[in-house]
């Protein structure tokens, strides 16, 4: 079995059967388990302090360095197809003509044609045929060849060192590719054994973008969603309907949803941004509801039927009935969940040792109306997760408020931003917790000190449950579990009440304390990364292991005695008995003294300044020590696997506490941002009001270094539904629009907001149309993109929506554009009565305020000082009459002659 604690790591320590013969204390490999246990009782081992894991004897480092067989390709490398052999694809060869190893490779490749197959050969993962060509080009590796049989000759081969496989696989996963790992399931035979026997190998892991568990392959601060979709196209009066299931196998979260409307599916997929999407698609063309950049994996030739899905769900969650899952009214979502579980079964199958697929929690059904709706355009315009210009984290809303200290807290805060709340009671409860943490600075700081060193318990528990956790993962789990009582004491002693979901921190499962204590009792505090070389388990844990260690101590004593004896026999006080990983134990003497060694010494190696020898006794004892050490390492691995299995059984309880800790971390982050930024707690109302006093942009305010941000008021929904905002170019109108949208969103995640005071009603959707670009690939001009976005708003906005418009109609003739802008404004203020701020350079729209009582005019002020224009960035009542476009052009660096000519043309047009 390949070690599950280190995906690309060591082979399982091979146990050695004791040889026959007389049993003596100095030949412990011949002792049975009972005698070793008795030895441990007679000579009990005392628990030692943490020691560095090192080689078992005095060592001299290897002078040789192995070169990697697959190195970055040089400039003279030519990977053109003309140089490839005719069998550059595995399907072109006859398996019977291949060597046994390559025949096995082709069989596995035929079962995984869509994945890159990495086949373990010694210290390398190799691939052949088309995968070798693909891998060499993707990773810039040397493309070489391997003899495949007399009738075939050489076939393409490329490979990567097994110790660097995680780095290379990470790059492949990042590119959206899937990888099948074929590892050795048994140790290589000892030297001198019969050659030509094919080692047992099989697929041990399938790595896909949506199913990876390894820390190095995941982004710590965001969920890694695997999504499955089942759709029913519109037929007659039946609308388009879809079911969605998404799971993060690294954290165990499992969500399902069912709804009408393909646009809603597109929005949900854009919000989740899954790493991988699986669905049934009978066409080669991607469906319109699927964002183009998502990695798709078509499943099967037939959609999953409801009976198949029900059977898979019952088996997965070990249920007799699905009534408790609440999926009866969402049949498409149930089928999607079944497809997702079937895909996990293919990529994470049960192995011979009972290693289970990643543990998932029971699915939670999400309903329309649970969260504020944000379409993809609004997410981009408000720059929630990344900036619009260069897609960078710095400069986004999440960057501005993320003070989280744990990876799970960062993911939680991101989820809050991506799905703001709609339930006023939940919003107020979360806001009350933030308020308490703001007012209690010592408590907030104490909580943050405890949270800072905490590991990612959510994902650590998942790896333990899937049998992939290493020893250091388990130690990190113990560290986190030990902090639960400290967090609980702080909260109960200083926080009045607290949210109900904090109960998993205040009253954790009692079994978690037992788990933490068991890890501390058994595992070293700083265990090695490798699970196959010992150094994992404390003394005093297992009598059999203690007995083996006693015998190893005896052998170390024998080696020390032997060194003294050989010094005396050779009359050489500088002689050293040393150990080398490759050459084993040897006697080292200087070249000058090498001619006067005893006759029974056997020369083993000659170096520049020393000679290395062995003796028959030393060689015999070396074999015994190696066998004994292998038995001890095997026993440590068995004990570790037992412990990991016990922890995996409690993965769900660990995750519950981890989710509570994540929420606590997110709350302290919001409190820290509010306390340090001078924010206020908004009043959440049941009406449509949005009254903001001295509001500020939460991101721009932090980015300003020299100048102070100019705060502004906003008033919507209290008699005014539409504000027509006019003012010069580059005066800050777009910033003001985004500021309003971000304050609305912050209020609905339960956060404080950057303002002096605020009263905010719940919005069902936020729409933005800020700036426009063409979409040439889709055959749409800038104006058509603008009109499509406007149409989407007019079709879906309601009186509880917040609409933020920055210029409509500017991409066509002036009067056409003005007419469109006027009609859109009337529709928003009249038919929809949606809360709207419309920034425009069509000053004619100021007349709407005289026609409709729910329309008001505002302007961004500027100050003219001679020929200069000073932007005040202050919003005031009333409409502007000029846009100062020529002055803005001058400030942007347009040549003076062009600016002067523009003024002349403007004067001519004005007359």
From Swiss-Prot:
Residues 1-95 are annotated as: Disordered. CDD domains: ABC_MutS1. One of its GO terms (molecular function) is ATP-dependent DNA damage sensor activity. It comes from the Bacteria. ATP binds at residues 727-734. Belongs to the DNA mismatch repair MutS family. GO terms for cellular component: cytosol. This protein is involved in the repair of mismatches in DNA. It is possible that it carries out the mismatch recognition step. This protein has a weak ATPase activity. This is DNA mismatch repair protein MutS. Keywords: ATP-binding, DNA damage, DNA repair, DNA-binding, Nucleotide-binding. Disulfide bonds: none annotated.
């Amino acid at each position: 079995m390949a070690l599950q604690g280190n995906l690309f790591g060591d082979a399982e320590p091979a146990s050695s059967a004791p040889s026959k013969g007389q049993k003596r204390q100095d030949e412990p490999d011949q002792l049975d388990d009972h005698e070793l246990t008795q030895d441990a009782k007679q000579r009990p081992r005392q628990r030692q302090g943490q020691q560095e894991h090192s080689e078992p004897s005095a060592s001299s480092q290897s002078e040789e360095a192995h070169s990697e067989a697959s190195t970055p390709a040089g400039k003279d490398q030519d990977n053109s197809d003309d140089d490839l052999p005719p069998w550059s694809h595995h399907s072109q060869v006859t398996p019977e003509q291949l060597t046994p190893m390559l025949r096995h490779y082709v069989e596995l490749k035929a079962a995984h044609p869509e994945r890159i197959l990495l086949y373990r050969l010694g210290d390398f993962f190799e691939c052949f045929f088309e995968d070798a060509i693909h891998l060499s080009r993707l990773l810039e590796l040397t493309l070489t060849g391997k003899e495949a049989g007399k009738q075939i000759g050489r076939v393409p081969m490329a490979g990567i060192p097994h110790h660097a496989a995680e780095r290379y696989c990470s790059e492949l996963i990042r590119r959206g590719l899937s990888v099948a790992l074929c590892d050795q399931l048994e140790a290589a035979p000892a030297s001198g054994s019969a050659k030509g026997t094919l080692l047992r190998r099989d697929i041990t892991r399938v790595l896909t973008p949506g199913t990876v568990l390894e820390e190095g392959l995941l982004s710590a601060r965001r969920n890694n969603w695997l999504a499955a979709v089942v759709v029913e196209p519109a037929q007659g009066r039946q609308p388009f309907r879809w079911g969605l299931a998404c799971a993060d196998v690294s954290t165990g979260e499992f969500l399902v949803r069912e709804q009408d409307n393909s646009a809603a599916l597109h929005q949900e997929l854009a919000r989740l941004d899954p790493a991988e999407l699986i669905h049934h698609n009978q066409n080669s063309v991607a469906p319109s509801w699927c964002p183009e950049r998502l990695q798709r994996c078509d499943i099967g030739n037939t959609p999953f039927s409801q009976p198949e899905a029900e059977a898979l769900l019952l088996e997965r969650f070990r249920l007799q009935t699905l009534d408790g899952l609440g999926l009866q009214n969402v049949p498409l979502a149930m089928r999607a969940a079944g497809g997702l579980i079937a895909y996990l079964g293919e990529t994470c199958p049960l192995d011979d040792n009972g290693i289970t697929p990643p543990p998932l929690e029971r699915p939670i059904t999400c309903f329309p109306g649970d969260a504020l709706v944000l379409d993809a355009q609004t997410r981009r315009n408000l720059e929630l997760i990344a900036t619009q210009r260069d897609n960078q984290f710095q400069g986004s809303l999440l960057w501005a408020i993320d003070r989280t200290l744990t990876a799970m807290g960062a993911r939680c805060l991101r989820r809050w931003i991506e799905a703001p709340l709609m339930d006023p009671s939940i919003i107020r409860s979360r806001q009350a917790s933030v308020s308490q943490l703001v007012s209690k600075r010592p408590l907030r700081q104490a909580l943050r000190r405890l949270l800072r060193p905490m590991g990612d318990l959510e994902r650590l528990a998942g790896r333990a449950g899937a049998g992939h956790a290493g020893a250091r993962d388990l130690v990190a789990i113990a560290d986190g579990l030990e902090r639960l009582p400290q967090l609980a004491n702080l909260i109960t002693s200083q926080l009045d009440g607290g949210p109900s979901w904090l109960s998993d921190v205040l009253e954790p499962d009692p079994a978690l304390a037992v788990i933490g204590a068991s890890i501390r009792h058994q595992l070293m505090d700083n265990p090695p990364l490798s699970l196959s070389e010992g150094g994992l388990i404390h003394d005093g844990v297992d009598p059999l292991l203690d007995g083996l260690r006693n015998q190893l101590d005896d052998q170390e004593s024998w080696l020390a005695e032997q060194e003294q004896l050989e010094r005396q026999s050779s009359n050489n006080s500088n002689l050293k008995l040393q150990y080398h990983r490759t050459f084993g134990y040897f006697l080292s003497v200087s070249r000058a003294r090498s001619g006067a060694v005893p006759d029974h010494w056997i020369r083993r190696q000659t170096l520049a300044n020393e000679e290395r020898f062995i003796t028959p006794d030393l060689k015999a004892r070396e074999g015994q020590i190696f066998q004994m050490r292998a038995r001890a390492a095997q026993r440590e691995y068995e004990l570790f696997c037992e412990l990991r299995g016990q922890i995996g059984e409690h993965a769900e309880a660990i995750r519950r506490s981890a989710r509570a800790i994540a929420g606590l971390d997110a709350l302290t982050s919001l409190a820290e941002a509010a306390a340090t930024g001078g924010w206020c707690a908004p009043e959440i109302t049941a009406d449509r009001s949005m009254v903001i006093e001295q509001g500020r942009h939460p991101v721009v305010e932090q980015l300003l270094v020299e100048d102070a941000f100019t705060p502004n008021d906003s008033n919507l929904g209290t008699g005014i539904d539409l504000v027509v905002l006019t003012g010069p170019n580059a005066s800050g109108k777009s910033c003001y629009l985004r500021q309003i949208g971000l304050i609305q969103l912050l209020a609905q995640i339960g956060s404080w907001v950057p303002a002096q005071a605020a009263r905010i009603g719940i919005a069902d959707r936020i729409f933005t149309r800020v700036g426009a670009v063409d979409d040439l690939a889709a055959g749409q001009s800038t104006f058509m993109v603008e009109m499509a976005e406007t149409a989407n708003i007019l079709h879906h906005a309601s009186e509880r929506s917040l609409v933020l418009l920055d210029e409509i109609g500017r991409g066509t003739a002036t009067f056409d554009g003005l007419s469109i802008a006027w009609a859109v404004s009337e529709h928003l203020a009249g038919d929809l009565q949606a809360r709207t701020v419309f920034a425009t350079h069509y000053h004619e729209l100021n007349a709407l305020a005289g026609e409709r009582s729910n329309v008001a005019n505002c302007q961004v002020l500027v100050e003219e000082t001679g020929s200069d224009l000073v932007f005040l960035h202050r919003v005031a009542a009333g409409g502007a009459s000029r846009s100062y476009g020529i002055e803005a052009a001058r400030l942007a660096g347009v040549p003076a002659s062009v600016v002067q000519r523009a003024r002349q043309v403007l004067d001519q047009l004005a007359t």
